[in-house]
Design a protein with these regions (language model features):
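N-terminal amphipathic/basic leader segments beginning at the initiator methionine
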Residues: 1-46, 50
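Short beta-strand elements
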Residues: 30-36, 59-61, 70, 156-160, ...
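Glycine-rich phosphate/pyrophosphate-binding loop regions near the starts of catalytic domains
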Residues: 32-88, 96, 105-107, 179-199
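Short, well-ordered amphipathic alpha-helical segments that serve as non-catalytic structural scaffolds
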Residues: 50-61, 84-97, 200-213, 247-259
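Short, surface-exposed loop/turn segments at secondary-structure boundaries that line and modulate
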Residues: 69, 74-81, 102-123, 215-237, ...
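Flexible, glycine/charged-enriched surface loops at secondary-structure junctions
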Residues: 99-103, 134-141, 155, 211-223, ...
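A glycine- and small/hydrophobic-rich beta-loop-beta segment
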Residues: 227, 231-273
Length: 273
């Protein structure tokens, strides 16, 4: 683990966190993360039979070539209008950031049944795009928090025979957590050059060994998402290097998962079985 700005430490990634008025009190509450170049991407989301509007919309996108994500609070059990709002958020954010329509995932967690305040969010998305920066990873990590007591993330350097790889991470989650993911969002960025199929396979294994093994209060969420973005700025990974990258991704997901358990709402003890 090294010092860095989380998801924006790998070259080619920018992020921001702004106050759009979702939380009140001037708190950062809208996060935007983008890659400046085409990426391989992998996405694992909730197994809930009632996924949120953000998950429903993001599933319609080409999951292997996403360029980033926009993150806010609350948009589950909101019916067809919720999906319309999620689509508008994704498309408006992409346009504001100068990215192709359909290239940004949309993620939400928060109060179930409340529609997004789209007027405030539209202004917030413009502000988030204007604030995008290679130093914005920590603001992004702060903006995605809801009931979290502290931001969760880190920066990691992986020394491989084929060259060094940098990995950044940001996550949120503190309640409604059970095996098969949780009320959680997690984002991992890397400059590694990985084929989309290889990245998806590694991401699924990492989720199974980390986020799918934690529980705080035994409740499943409709919004859980793990998104991994690899922009290819670094060395290509294959063979042993690819296997070592997969091991590192798994270790990072376990690290983030343990932070979620330690930050469980009302938790006084963390137990490993």
């Amino acid at each position: 683990r090294i010092e860095g700005t989380g998801v924006t430490t790998p070259d080619g990634f920018r992020a921001s966190g702004v106050a759009a008025g979702l939380k009140g009190g001037g708190q950062l509450d809208l996060g935007l993360l983008v890659s400046d170049r085409a990426t391989a991407s992998a996405l694992v989301d909730t197994p809930s039979a009632l996924p949120s509007a953000a998950v429903i919309y993001t599933r319609t996108l080409h999951a292997g070539s996403l360029r980033g994500v926009v993150v806010n609070c609350a948009n589950a059990a909101t019916g067809e209008q919720g999906v319309v709002d999620a689509r508008a958020m994704g498309e408006t954010s992409a346009a504001a950031a100068g990215l192709p329509v359909g290239s940004l995932a949309v993620c939400s967690t928060g109060v179930i049944g409340e529609r997004l305040p789209m007027k405030a969010l539209t202004a917030g998305m413009d502000a988030a795009a204007a604030a995008l920066s290679a130093d914005g990873g920590l603001d992004f990590g702060e903006a995605i928090r809801t009931t979290d007591a502290f931001p969760k993330g880190g920066t990691f350097r992986l020394a491989l025979p084929g060259g060094d790889v940098t990995i950044g991470a940001a996550a949120k989650g503190a309640g409604m957590i059970r095996p098969d993911m949780a009320t959680m969002l997690a984002y991992v960025t890397t400059d590694a050059c990985v084929l989309p199929d290889d990245l998806l396979a590694a991401t699924r294994v990492a989720a199974a060994g980390g986020f799918n093994r934690i529980s705080v209060d035994g409740q499943m969420s409709p919004s859980d998402t793990l998104l991994v973005l690899a922009n290819g700025e670094g060395p290509p990974l294959e063979g042993d290097d690819l296997a070592l990258f997969g091991d590192a991704l798994g270790a990072i997901c376990r690290f983030l998962a343990i932070l979620m358990v330690k930050d469980g709402e009302g938790a006084e003890h963390a137990v490993r079985v």
